[in-house]
Curated annotation (Swiss-Prot):
Binding site for L-glutamine: 52-54, 84, 130-131
Chemical reaction(s) catalysed: chorismate + L-glutamine = anthranilate + pyruvate + L-glutamate + H(+)
Species, as recorded: Azospirillum brasilense
Cited function: Part of a heterotetrameric complex that catalyzes the two-step biosynthesis of anthranilate, an intermediate in the biosynthesis of L-tryptophan. In the first step, the glutamine-binding beta subunit (TrpG) of anthranilate synthase (AS) provides the glutamine amidotransferase activity which generates ammonia as a substrate that, along with chorismate, is used in the second step, catalyzed by the large alpha subunit of AS (TrpE) to produce anthranilate. In the absence of TrpG, TrpE can synthesize anthranilate directly from chorismate and high concentrations of ammonia.
Protein's GO biological process: L-tryptophan biosynthetic process
Pathway, per record: Amino-acid biosynthesis; L-tryptophan biosynthesis; L-tryptophan from chorismate: step 1/5
Active site, renumbered: 80 (nucleophile), 169 (for gatase activity), 171 (for gatase activity)
Lineage: Bacteria, Pseudomonadati, Pseudomonadota, Alphaproteobacteria, Rhodospirillales
Entry GO terms, CC: cytosol
Top-level division of the source organism's lineage: Bacteria
Name the record gives this protein: Anthranilate synthase component 2
Keyword Transmembrane (UniProt): no
Known EC number: 4.1.3.27
Signal peptide: none
Amino acid sequence: MLLLIDNYDSFTYNLVHYLGELGAELDVRRNDSLTVEEAMALRPEGIVLSPGPCDPDKAGICLPLIDAAAKAAVPLMGVCLGHQAIGQPFGGTVVRAPVPMHGKVDRMFHQGRGVLKDLPSPFRATRYHSLIVERATLPACLEVTGETEDGLIMALSHRELPIHGVQFHPESIESEHGHKILENFLNTTRRLETAA
């Protein structure tokens, strides 16, 4: 079972739909409807942090849940707000983007790592955000796995743990390869099941 944390965003159920199409069993909970302890007691095979309208500090249990997932090596993927939230517990800073993006389709450049494995570079992805993880503050444990042409971080992964984030919206109809990106994340949860 995947635990999907809903950060009160209209895109949440697009994620639910895409993940369901890929065969994932989901338990969807609002970010303020359970504690970190309750979330981890569900023993999720993976955790997805949805987009949302706020900054990571106001996203309910997201920040401490990332810490708990990291300590337990539970695969975790963040989308938009969820991606930004991944940067903070490891020491990164979330700042205002140079230009707010609301429904802009942009080209994503990458090296085929993390959840962007086996995708062409560049590909088209939809951006809805006014905040970004600041590259200058990115801690050594996180690596940039995708970026815009002007170098803004659009995807990151933990170097040792199964933790991944994408700033763009793979669940948007305008984004290319959304199902494949989510499938790549699901494969990290399945590999851990097989190893257990």
